[in-house]
């Protein structure tokens, strides 16, 4: 009897199990079909999945590749910057949350420094916001101030995240290219690339909410002069437009040039957000600290975005950065101040890259600022038949060069909208904030390549 009951229970249980499996299969297919619709991306990121840094950083990850692509230093940051972080990491209280809009000692140091540069008082609590890198500053600014239906003017070439950030806010990017003046019998300079004032004004209208300015410029290295900035300022005032001024390379300006802040122009402080970067200032890109400076009536909206997204930035990094700033603020007129010594060091590296590229018949555009140099590489004319045909020339060239020559760079058309890619697709960008040994290795590759061609 017991065995019979057990057998019946087993059969009953098996039947239930099979029924469950059968039902779950049916339900599983049904649920999967329904849920797959919910796995689709939000419309605001439609078409934004391609990213030049993801693609080309992966290619350059091979240790045998000389990486002149991504814009990070392989030179050492200042010793005192690293020492400050080491000391601060040992202080228990500085390993906890700090003020969400910027660690008190850091915003105080920033206000002291920028009051000298702006020649005006800056409220450290209301007019400065510390962010997760300059990216964080851009994101906060665009999310806080740009709305669906707005238009934002982007100057081509532009740093590649500008367009996706504008589109994610539901706004429309409006493009205007820098155009080169004719160059006869002299070196090509970033100052030869200018905006046409009439063409620029044609991009402004009642929907224009902002223009994004980048000076010193990435990737061209252009440093806008006073006359050029005045044209932009006049149009911003005339059309009641905001200016988002990306000035992360503000200290990296070379002989004969001067960095000017558009926020210091009459009528511009009240409509400008200026963006800075610790990574570019002290060669610590991995720290991911940036800041926004502007009037309280704008900064308060950026604070709203930050408090509801990342909330705060790393306390020990902010304290170490504050102490590093104070060290250099106290010696700003001294050649040893990093704000003065780094551009001098980089100018030598820039000139070396210019000579190298010219020696193999290429035509570089000599940058007046920043730490990138772009060059027309069409004369090298390699066989790119094994590369994908549906990509711009510079994408194919850089992939070919990385694979076959073990030298990486960044295609300049990545900094362009679709309509202007053809204007820049014969250019690639090299980064020269590198150790001499890295530049030596790049020189060997380029010179050997030139010999093979001849």
UniProtKB/Swiss-Prot annotation:
Binding, substrate: 71, 218, 429
Residues where N6-(pyridoxal phosphate)lysine is found: 280
Gene Ontology terms: biological process: 2-oxoglutarate metabolic process; amino acid metabolic process; biosynthetic process; kynurenine metabolic process; L-kynurenine catabolic process
Pathway linked to the protein: Amino-acid degradation; L-kynurenine degradation; kynurenate from L-kynurenine: step 1/2
Location of N6-acetyllysine modifications: 116
N6-succinyllysine modified-residue sites: 116
Catalytic activity annotation: L-kynurenine + 2-oxoglutarate = kynurenate + L-glutamate + H2O; L-kynurenine + glyoxylate = kynurenate + glycine + H2O; 3-hydroxy-L-kynurenine + glyoxylate = xanthurenate + glycine + H2O; an S-substituted L-cysteine + H2O = a thiol + pyruvate + NH4(+)
One Pfam family recorded for the sequence: Aminotran_1_2
Keywords recorded for this protein, A-Z: Acetylation, Aminotransferase, Lyase, Pyridoxal phosphate, Transferase
Domain of life: Eukaryota
Listed cofactors: pyridoxal 5'-phosphate
EC number(s) stated in the UniProt entry for this protein: 2.6.1.7, 4.4.1.13, 2.6.1.63
CC terms in the record's Gene Ontology section: cytoplasm; mitochondrion
GO MF annotation terms: cysteine-S-conjugate beta-lyase activity; kynurenine-glyoxylate transaminase activity; kynurenine-oxoglutarate transaminase activity; protein homodimerization activity; pyridoxal phosphate binding; RNA binding
Family: Belongs to the class-I pyridoxal-phosphate-dependent aminotransferase family.
Subunit structure comment from the entry: Homodimer.
Reported function: Catalyzes the irreversible transamination of the L-tryptophan metabolite L-kynurenine to form kynurenic acid (KA), an intermediate in the tryptophan catabolic pathway which is also a broad spectrum antagonist of the three ionotropic excitatory amino acid receptors among others. May catalyze the beta-elimination of S-conjugates and Se-conjugates of L-(seleno)cysteine, resulting in the cleavage of the C-S or C-Se bond.
Descriptive protein name: Kynurenine--oxoglutarate transaminase 3
Organism whose genome encodes this protein: Homo sapiens (Human)
Taxonomic lineage: Eukaryota, Metazoa, Chordata, Craniata, Vertebrata
Underlying gene: KYAT3
